[in-house]
């Protein structure tokens, strides 16, 4: 048995989109078959059925109503799938044989433009990447807004990952032969990004002509070939999926990576620039703290400003001056914001115009939006700052477009453009004439109903309409005896009524329906003409939309500054960051007002180059370091900052090594990840960079960690090509000695108050190093059991009391009732264990600090040998094992007992079956066997 004609057609279409789920239009449904059906039924929770297809087995099948497709498509695209839409290309009733079908669009994560899928304040970027030898180029487009950005640089994975982190594309288009290891790196860092591959020829084909045709600002001599290839490949993919040249993508914007503040992937995450660390949502991020925008366009623009802070003084100061002027004119600012609230998403509306998917209601939204532009232009004329003056000169009021839309479209048109009820009365004579005919016909129908009621005496008689039978007279069965003989022609019999027609009624029906059909056709034709006119003027509307979004951003920054008592920072060229009473812009918003403790900061490239911060955990070191970085970023986007005074030098890069890393989930150790991040910082930072380092060396032994931290400080301060502004938090108090030996190191600490054996974190950064870590007190605050706290204090007293001796013997805790004992030897000579064999200990060489500091090359780093401390654990019968550890081991059997006791206390015996009770008892008995 052969395949059915319909199934042959399906398989032919499917062959052209193997990587997509094919939505195959059959009547009023999109059907999916074979593997596509299995995937869709699982993802969309649809019933999987079957269909005879000419094979021995029925083809797996599931389907969705075509009018509800967007909901299902959105779910599949969100899960990373691509959808190919195969439509009927001819009227089934007029076709002979099988209906002609074809793919009209391929929907992918980076090209989906349905408003229910998109976040209004966030771009939906698709990215292309092209690699050629040691150079790479990247292009980013948002087809819903028309943005298209390109850049290139020397190829470094870190650079590419930084740009991906900045733009957060939903999809990346790559050349099909690119190394899988690079794709793996991307997927490891950004698991939610969809990867698509195209052939090399799609990047190369007809480059200059394609770019000239698409971009009205393209000059082939201004762009490197690799940039043009990247842009060409992305344009090919967009056209391949959309089956259309999108007129809203009409300008290519080239940017240089070095023209903006570089914030690498880890730093964006650690500083919580646009999303918080825990939930990966906007709340709790810098963007959340600064976003008071009133338009979707402004929300997206503010995100871009925060993702790409400026590094040139003039544009930064232009923004700052504009924000200052808004703060000095509160009344004008409020008027501006009030009009901004009435502006819809112009960029995405004209994007729908370009894709021919806009409806009349959206054009009314466009009309209302551009109707506010003349008022905004008038407000701008009252300002004096350069940025506002330039905006006032450049903004297009679009009055001709507003006039057309106001004259042509009804204020409340139909949602569908193919159902009529779109064009306003007086715009077109033929529309008015047909509407009158339609209206008169319906009046005639109403008068007919009244006349028939009166002449027959049937009060319940009514004239109705449906699409199957047209107009008809309906009389209930109870009144059929009142129907005059021969007055009506029977049309349909129902269970409780009869339906009739008359020749006059059918004649009027033809007039009414003919008028309605013609009216719908004419209204749709007029609508497409209006849409085409708007499409011809997309560039004008996009320019105005960008100005509105900039105004919205500036108003947002002014509002936040006013509400939170921010001040205007001074931008200097002295390589100095001076902040008086600085505050963390996010933390102060999530704690009661006025409770945040402000702190001063002074960092430069000379005497205060590396600020060494000591103090206990939870005291506020990380918050302090982050606030310095965030204040710097805020200043460089043109925002006022949370401080009493701020003198900020422009930074080219910000690096952080703070907190845990996502790479831990990929199987990399804490220490390895930390060292990789530190290595990246030391290789890429410059004298213009700001570096935040928190607890460098914590992931290994004390001596190794101290040595590495010491060496990193030396490298930063003594390397003449580096000397970056650095905040360095540490628990290694030995490092505080470096202030006396290395130029630029300054000791600071977090003040702590001790009251009746309790500590209070004052959150104040003061000069001088901390004299102790308060680790046990922090552990107590964290809720460690009191036996652990008491034992820790006991051990600490032994260590501190005997630290000058060569060996340290710590007696076992009586509370633990353990027969083990621990001997920690610090003797540098050979000793003998209980079996008489020699145990050798490496010696920790005494380091001459002065010698290290005087070494100008900084290539000789702190060298020390790790001291192996052998712990011998003995019991009464024999030596069980011998281990070499970095500290001492403690028997924690009591913790196991506590857990078992707690488990027994929590047993709900009344709600357990006898068998459940028996199993629980058996489980507890097994657990107690592990306890001596």
Swiss-Prot record:
Residues involved in ATP binding: 615-622
Taxonomic source organism: Clostridium botulinum (strain Hall / ATCC 3502 / NCTC 13319 / Type A)
Entry's transmembrane regions: none
GO biological process, one term: mismatch repair
This protein's GO CC annotations: cytosol
Alphabetical keyword list: ATP-binding, DNA damage, DNA repair, DNA-binding, Nucleotide-binding
Function: This protein is involved in the repair of mismatches in DNA. It is possible that it carries out the mismatch recognition step. This protein has a weak ATPase activity.
SMART domains: MUTSac, MUTSd
Top-level taxon in the UniProt lineage: Bacteria
Keyword Cell membrane: no
Protein's UniProt name: DNA mismatch repair protein MutS
GO molecular function: ATP binding; ATP-dependent DNA damage sensor activity; damaged DNA binding; mismatched DNA binding
Family, per entry: Belongs to the DNA mismatch repair MutS family.
């Amino acid at each position: 048995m052969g395949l059915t004609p319909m199934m042959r057609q399906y398989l032919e279409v499917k062959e052209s989109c193997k990587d997509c789920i094919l939505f195959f239009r059959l009547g009023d449904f999109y059907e999916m078959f074979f593997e596509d059906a299995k995937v869709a039924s699982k993802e969309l929770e649809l019933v999987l059925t079957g269909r005879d297809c000419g094979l021995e087995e029925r083809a797996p099948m599931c389907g969705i109503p075509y009018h509800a497709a967007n909901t299902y498509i959105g779910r599949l695209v969100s899960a990373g799938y691509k959808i190919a839409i195969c439509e009927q290309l001819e009227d089934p009733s007029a076709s002979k044989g099988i209906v002609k079908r074809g793919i009209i669009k391929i929907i992918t994560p980076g090209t989906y433009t349905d408003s229910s899928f998109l976040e209004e304040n966030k771009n939906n970027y698709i990215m292309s990447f092209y690699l050629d030898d040691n150079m790479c180029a990247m292009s980013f487009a948002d087809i819903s807004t028309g943005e298209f950005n390109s850049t290139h640089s020397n190829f470094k994975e870190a650079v590419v990952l930084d740009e991906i982190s900045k733009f957060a594309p939903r999809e990346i288009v790559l050349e099909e032969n690119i190394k899988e290891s690079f794709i793996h790196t991307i997927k490891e860092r950004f698991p939610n990004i969809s990867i698509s591959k195209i052939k090399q020829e799609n990047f190369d084909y007809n480059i200059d002509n394609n770019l000239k045709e698409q971009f009205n600002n393209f000059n082939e001599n201004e762009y490197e070939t690799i940039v043009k290839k990247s842009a060409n490949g992305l344009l090919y993919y967009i056209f391949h999926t959309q089956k259309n040249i999108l007129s809203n993508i009409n300008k290519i914007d080239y940017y240089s990576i070095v023209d903006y503040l570089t914030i690498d992937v880890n730093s964006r995450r650690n500083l919580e620039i646009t999303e918080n660390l825990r939930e990966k949502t906007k709340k709790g991020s810098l963007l959340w703290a600064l976003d008071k925008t009133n338009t979707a366009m402004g929300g997206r623009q503010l995100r871009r400003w925060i993702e790409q802070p400026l590094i040139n003084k003039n544009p930064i100061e232009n923004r700052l001056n504009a924000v200052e002027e808004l703060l000095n004119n509160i009344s004008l600012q409020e008027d501006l914001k009030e009009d901004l609230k009435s502006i819809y998403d112009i960029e995405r509306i004209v994007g729908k115009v370009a894709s021919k998917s806009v409806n009349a209601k959206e054009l009314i939204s466009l009309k209302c939006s551009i109707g506010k532009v003349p008022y905004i232009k008038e407000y701008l004329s009252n300002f004096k700052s350069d940025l506002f003056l330039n905006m006032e000169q450049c903004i297009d009021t679009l009055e001709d477009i507003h006039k057309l839309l106001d004259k042509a479209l009804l204020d409340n048109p139909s949602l569908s453009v193919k159902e009529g009820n779109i064009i306003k009365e007086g715009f077109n004579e033929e529309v008015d004439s047909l509407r009158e005919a339609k209206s008169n016909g319906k009046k005639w129908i109403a008068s007919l109903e009244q006349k028939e009621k009166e002449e027959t005496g049937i009060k319940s008689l009514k004239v109705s309409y449906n699409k199957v039978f047209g107009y008809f007279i309906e009389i209930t069965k109870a009144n059929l005896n009142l129907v005059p003989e021969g007055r009506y022609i029977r049309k349909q019999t129902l269970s409780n009524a009869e339906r009739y027609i008359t020749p006059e009624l059918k004649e009027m029906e033809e007039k009414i329906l003919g008028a309605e059909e013609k009216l719908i056709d004419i209204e749709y034709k007029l609508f497409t003409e209006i849409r085409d006119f708007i499409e011809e003027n997309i560039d004008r509307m996009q320019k105005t939309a960008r100005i509105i979004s900039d105004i919205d951003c500036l108003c947002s920054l002014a509002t936040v500054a006013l509400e939170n008592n921010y001040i205007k920072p001074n931008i200097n060229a002295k390589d100095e960051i001076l902040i008086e009473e600085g505050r963390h812009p996010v933390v102060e918003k999530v704690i009661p007002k006025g409770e945040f403790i402000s702190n001063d900061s002074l960092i430069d490239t000379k005497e205060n180059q590396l600020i060494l911060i000591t103090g206990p955990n939870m005291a506020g070191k990380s918050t302090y370091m982050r606030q310095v970085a965030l204040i710097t970023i805020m200043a460089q986007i043109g925002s006022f900052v949370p401080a009493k005074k701020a003198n900020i030098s422009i930074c080219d890069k910000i690096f952080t090594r703070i907190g845990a890393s996502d790479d831990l989930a990929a199987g990399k150790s804490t220490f390895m990840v930390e060292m990789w991040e530190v290595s990246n910082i030391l290789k890429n930072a410059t004298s213009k960079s700001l570096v935040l380092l928190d607890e460098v060396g914590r992931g290994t032994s004390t001596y190794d960690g101290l040595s590495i931290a010491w060496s990193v400080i030396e490298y930063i301060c003594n390397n003449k090509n580096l000397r970056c502004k650095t905040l360095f938090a540490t628990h290694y108090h030995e490092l505080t000695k470096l202030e006396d030996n290395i130029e630029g190191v300054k000791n600071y600490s977090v003040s702590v108050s001790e009251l009746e054996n309790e500590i209070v974190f004052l959150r104040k950064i003061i000069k001088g190093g901390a004299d102790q870590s308060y680790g046990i007190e922090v552990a107590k605050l964290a809720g460690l059991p009191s036996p652990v706290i008491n034992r820790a204090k006991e051990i600490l007293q032994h260590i501190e009391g005997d630290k000058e001796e060569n060996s340290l013997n710590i007696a076992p805790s009586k509370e633990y009732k353990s027969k083990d004992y621990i001997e920690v030897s610090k003797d540098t000579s050979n000793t003998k264990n209980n079996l008489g064999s020699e145990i050798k200990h490496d010696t920790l060489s005494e380091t001459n600090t002065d010698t290290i500091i005087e070494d100008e090359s900084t290539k000789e780093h702190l060298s020390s040998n790790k001291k192996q401390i052998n712990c011998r654990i003995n019991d009464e019968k024999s030596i069980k094992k011998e281990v070499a550890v970095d500290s001492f081991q403690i028997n924690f059997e009591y913790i196991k007992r506590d857990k078992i006791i707690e488990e027994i206390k929590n047993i709900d015996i009344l709600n357990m079956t006898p068998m459940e009770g028996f199993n629980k008892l058996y489980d507890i008995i097994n657990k107690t066997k592990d306890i001596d």
